[in-house]
Amino acid sequence: MIIIVRLAGEIGIKSPRSRKNFEHALINNIKNVIDVEEVSIDQGYIILNTKGDFSKLSKVFGIASFSPADVISFSKLQDIVDFVKNKYAEKVKGKKFAIRVRRVGKHNFTSLDAAKVIGSSLYPYSSGVDLENPEIEIHVDIRQDYAYVYDKVYEGARGLPIGTTGRTIVLFSGGFDSPIATWMMMKRGSSVTLLNFKLGGEVHKKIVLDEVKILSEWNSGHKIKVYFVNGIKVLSALAGVKRYIRVVVLKRIMYKTAELLAKKINAYSVTTGESLSQVSSQTMKNLFVTEYDINIPIFRPLIGFDKEEIIELSRKVGTYEYSSKLPEYCAISSKSTTSANLEEVLESEKQVNIEYEKLIDEAEVVEV
């Protein structure tokens, strides 16, 4: 079976060298998820020859859309007309149809000429032509002396191929936000390593791993590594911190742990699921205090999203079922300030005895 894969739009406008790198990465990712017998690149298309199930392509980032297609050789336009008529005369019976022609190369006919002639050959068998809302849409993509013919276009995940933009450490609580922040960074081509402060025992861990299994379906066959840090030990160390700044200090500990892990595994950023002013610790002032003197980029892909939008995305991605079962363990104080004082937070942090190297060294590491 021949599958046409169309590249996500922004890949096509990159420099020739960058585009080649992205195409190579995408092809490798495709080979990770479906059985490909042969692959080639044809003027903006990746052409796959496969006998396997191709539906998994819908979750491969870097793909705009894909179609199973027939490939035909021709010497004259009538060859294409005859093929399309033989294949689709029965399929258009009683239906409104449309012909979509795209053409690359030099021919003695235009795309419009081809569409008219092909459409005329099918018209007697159909209920007529409807270019706005056809019941069946037949595509003919013409190259020099061959053409791709198909009637199904499946949506891809778009974005950039996994592994093309570097690695990020995701602070992954397992609630609604962090899985979607992870997914959005994956969509931008990032490899992800997850850091979880295990606050809810084995129940918490199981839900997190269930979510990671869902995210793995979008990860182009690559494994996702999760570091489970002893969160209870961290909370115990915060016992002497004033309640109204305790969450901010906890977040700083999380950031610093993630920063250290990033240095250890050559990641270039830290990603969080924070959304501006969604909760008290996520006001602009508190975010400033939280990331003060953190020397690595902090990405917040959900910063402008509201909770309803995040939950809707979780349904699309597939993590909703598991996220809805997990309490927000980071809500450790109901009286948190919305405007933490930087000097007070830094002074309180000095009193907290955290061995960051030890936290990471003693973390349980699970690969999904």
Swiss-Prot record:
Keyword Nucleotide-binding in record: yes
Main subcellular localisation: cytoplasm
Positions annotated to bind ATP: L171, F172, N196, F197, K251, G273, Q282
Keywords: ATP-binding, Cytoplasm, Nucleotide-binding, RNA-binding, Thiamine biosynthesis, Transferase, tRNA-binding
EC annotation from Swiss-Prot or TrEMBL: 2.8.1.4
Catalytic activity, reaction form: [ThiI sulfur-carrier protein]-S-sulfanyl-L-cysteine + a uridine in tRNA + 2 reduced [2Fe-2S]-[ferredoxin] + ATP + H(+) = [ThiI sulfur-carrier protein]-L-cysteine + a 4-thiouridine in tRNA + 2 oxidized [2Fe-2S]-[ferredoxin] + AMP + diphosphate; [ThiS sulfur-carrier protein]-C-terminal Gly-Gly-AMP + S-sulfanyl-L-cysteinyl-[cysteine desulfurase] + AH2 = [ThiS sulfur-carrier protein]-C-terminal-Gly-aminoethanethioate + L-cysteinyl-[cysteine desulfurase] + A + AMP + 2 H(+)
Gene3D superfamilies reported in the protein's UniProt record: 3.30.2130.30, HUPs (3.40.50.620)
Job description of the protein: Catalyzes the ATP-dependent transfer of a sulfur to tRNA to produce 4-thiouridine in position 8 of tRNAs, which functions as a near-UV photosensor. Also catalyzes the transfer of sulfur to the sulfur carrier protein ThiS, forming ThiS-thiocarboxylate. This is a step in the synthesis of thiazole, in the thiamine biosynthesis pathway. The sulfur is donated as persulfide by IscS.
NCBIfam families per UniProt: tRNA uracil 4-sulfurtransferase ThiI
PANTHER family registered for this protein in UniProt: TRNA SULFURTRANSFERASE
Descriptive protein name: Probable tRNA sulfurtransferase
Organism of provenance: Sulfurisphaera tokodaii (strain DSM 16993 / JCM 10545 / NBRC 100140 / 7)
Gene label: thiI
